Structure formats: structure tokens, C-alpha cells
């Protein structure tokens, strides 16, 4: 599931990325101080972010999976217009009507001293 999210980010298409989120999904994004719940606010976040050329590299991931839930946390790097931003993430994916959707996504810039 995380790989699908990365692939959609690389398309630079906000609607493709936002479509991965549950209708009641929550996004605490790396580049925003706003809590975004629901499709419209999540779409708005990615419309703003993807105005730039964005790439994502997974550094580490730790996944727990059941038949209907995946929790995935770790580190990734955003490359935004050639500048690297080191960040940490937590995703919760839920299976809804046979499709996996992002229920919760928290991402924040990695502190400089860790």
C-alpha cells in the first residue's frame, strides 16, 4: 500500500493521491499545520504540494498487517524541487468494500538532532 501512495505522488496528480484516502480519512501533512479530515481538505493539501516537482524515497518502514488493517511507520525523504526533506510517517490503511484506503496519515519533518 505504501508503494502505491509513493507511485501516486510521483504522478504529480493531486486527485490520484487524494483518491487513496478513506472518505473520513485524516491527514496531518509534512508541509502544513492544518489537520485535514475528509476528501476535500486532503485534496487541497496535495493540490498545493504537487504544484512543485515532488519525489519520495522510503528509507525505512515497519509494517503490521491483518486481513482488514495495515499499520505502517518509518522514515522517508521528500525531494521537492530538488531539495531533500527528511521526514517520519505513520499510515493506517483499512480495507473498505474490498479496497484499501488510508484512514490516517501522519507525517512530520525529522528533528535535526535525533
For every predicted segment, state its role.
Residues 11-24:
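Short, well-ordered alpha-helical segments enriched in acidic and aromatic residues
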Residues 26-35, 47-52:
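A short gly/proline-enriched turn/hairpin at secondary-structure junctions
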Residues 27-28, 72, 102:
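Short hydrophobic/aromatic-rich beta-strand segments that constitute the beta-sheet cores
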Amino acid at each position: 500500500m505504501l508503494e502505491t501512495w509513493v507511485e501516486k505522488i510521483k504522478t504529480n496528480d493531486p486527485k490520484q493521491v487524494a483518491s487513496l484516502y478513506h472518505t473520513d480519512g485524516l491527514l496531518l501533512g509534512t508541509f502544513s499545520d492544518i489537520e485535514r479530515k475528509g476528501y476535500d481538505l486532503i485534496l487541497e493539501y496535495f493540490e498545493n504540494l504537487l504544484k512543485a516537482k515532488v519525489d519520495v524515497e522510503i528509507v525505512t518502514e515497519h509494517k503490521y498487517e491483518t486481513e482488514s488493517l495495515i499499520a505502517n511507520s518509518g522514515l522517508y525523504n521528500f525531494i521537492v524541487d530538488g531539495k531533500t526533506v527528511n521526514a517520519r510517517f505513520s499510515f493506517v490503511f483499512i480495507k473498505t468494500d474490498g479496497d484499501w484506503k488510508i484512514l490516517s496519515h501522519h507525517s512530520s519533518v525529522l528533528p535535526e538532532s535525533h
